[in-house]
Structures are given as structure tokens and as C-alpha cells.
């Protein structure tokens, strides 16, 4: 089944000076959930991540996420499996009222140094709806069959 959605939310962005020649975030395939984000490190100063190190990598853009949505910053599976490169605090959340440059916390969990070069696809960004709840303090919660069973309580 093919669905044509002409009512997609609009993601407005501002290109910063450090993002001057970078491609806009984009979906690599028609069915992709996430847009690729690229590294806005200087071309003559690639960033070297040694095993165990982490770095805050600029994207070169400010995003105006539509109200009622968030941008989730997630690792790219290829970087993770091939090189051990992942995003910390994943998924990272960009709130709709944030107006600073989006940066990605990358960590090298691999065994070898990894070089991040200008324009390299470093993460993916998923735009997702947000639900804000009303908070109510109570003295107890309703009972369930599971109860307070936590980690591993439903089986392996």
C-alpha cells in the first residue's frame, strides 16, 4: 500500500557558517524514518576519536522543530556495527523550543581510532510527535498482574 502524505510537518532550519557547503539533512530512501545528519567539522581539521573517547560534533544547522514534535537524534547502525561509533544519551531529544545549533554526542566504543571528516553522515534524526501529560500525585497506583516486577521479570 502506498500512502501519499501531503500534510507532513515542516522542519525549518537555519544554515550556520560552519554548515556552508553541507548537504541538507535528508532521507536516504523513500521508506527511511530518519534523516541523516552530517559532521560540520572543519575540512582541514578532521576529528579523531580514540577508543573510549567522546566528542560533541556540530551539524552546522539550527532546527525549528514544529510545536507538538521533537527531533530524536539516534546512532547510524552502519557506524555502530562497523566501527563501534554511537550516540550517547540516545535518543537525544531536540525540543520544539530549542534554537541553538544541533550537535551530536558521539562515542567510540570500538577498538580502533575513528576519524570524523567534514560532511560525514554521523547520526540520524527522527521527527516524532510529543504528548505532554497532566501530573497527579496519588498515594498508591492501581494493581496489575505484573506488579512491581522489574528487570527480567517477564522472562528472557
UniProtKB/Swiss-Prot annotation:
Signal peptide: none annotated. The keyword Metal-binding applies. It comes from the Bacteria. Its EC number is 3.6.1.23. It catalyses: dUTP + H2O = dUMP + diphosphate + H(+). Its cofactor is Mg(2+). Keywords: Hydrolase, Magnesium, Metal-binding, Nucleotide metabolism. The keyword Iron does not apply. Gene3D superfamilies: 2.70.40.10. One of its GO terms (biological process) is dUTP catabolic process. GO terms for molecular function: dUTP diphosphatase activity; magnesium ion binding. Substrate binds at residues 76-78, 89, 93-95, 103. Pathway: Pyrimidine metabolism; dUMP biosynthesis; dUMP from dCTP (dUTP route): step 2/2. Belongs to the dUTPase family. HAMAP family: dUTPase_bact (MF_00116). This enzyme is involved in nucleotide metabolism: it produces dUMP, the immediate precursor of thymidine nucleotides and it decreases the intracellular concentration of dUTP so that uracil cannot be incorporated into DNA. This is Deoxyuridine 5'-triphosphate nucleotidohydrolase. The gene is dut.
